[in-house]
Amino acid sequence: MAYCPFQFSPLAIFVLEELFVDDLLLQLNNISVVYSDVIQVLKGVSLAVEKNHIVSLLGSNGAGKTTTLKAISGLLKPENGRVTDGTILYRNGEIQNRAPETITRQGIIQVLEGRQPFKYLTIEENLRVGTATRWGNPYREDLEKVYHYFPALEKRKKGLAGYCSGGELQMLVMGRALMAHPELLLLDEPSLGLAPLVVREIFRIVRRINEEEGTTIILVEQNARMALQIAHYGYVMENGKIVMEGKAEALRENPDVREFYLGMSAAGTAKSYTDVKSYRRRKRWL
């Protein structure tokens, strides 16, 4: 056992532990998720999210990223899924398998992949839907805040959401989430199918929301390069397990992450898609 020159009193240890816990907003402790009592998707996933941080969750298709978000937000039940083992702690209270409306009222809001608006409502009407969990509260100020981050929405606020472009739809669903005053925002593949210029703008806004609103964000994203540029911390998932974690800057420099998710060789040169073999990734980590 290594010698430690410092000795702490029990009171000091308690205070240090409390300070550390107070910095954590969310903890997943060894959770497993099963669909239809048959298909196990998550196998002992543990992660921690500090307040006011952006945490990126990386991994290939089918790794379990979206299921992790749905376990947090309570959206497993509509898909006949449930957390069978482990605990999910939010503000130090257990929330696993709670009703999604209860979790939403606690301040956890998920922006689902796919950008599904109410097509026959206007953009502004769609945004007002985001206030459904806080009836009686004024919303005009919140609309102004959303338009501050997404000025393109204000220009078209009376137009039907069904006529929005992909980028406008992504802004709309993120704006609708902001209307609910999230403490923890779960973003699932915000860059999916968008042009590179739009992707850069979306990620710039995500960073601003984190910095200016103090919103804690978990970001599930295939675009690992962009995700790790704005994240504070990251986790890599493979086959329902966490196989790697670390500060974002450390993950950007990790040889495995560079090869399998950033498409870079050890020498720093770009690799073609055919050179990045998924079986090599699985063999190395599993």
Model features per residue range: what roles?
Residues S73:
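Helix-to-loop junction immediately C-terminal to a conserved catalytic motif
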Residues L121, Y163-C164, A177-L178:
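ABC ATPase signature
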Residues M179-E183:
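A short, proline-enriched helix->beta-strand linker immediately N-terminal to the Walker B motif
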Residues R200-G214:
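Helical segment within the ABC ATPase nucleotide-binding domain
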Residues G263-L286:
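ABC ATPase nucleotide-binding domains
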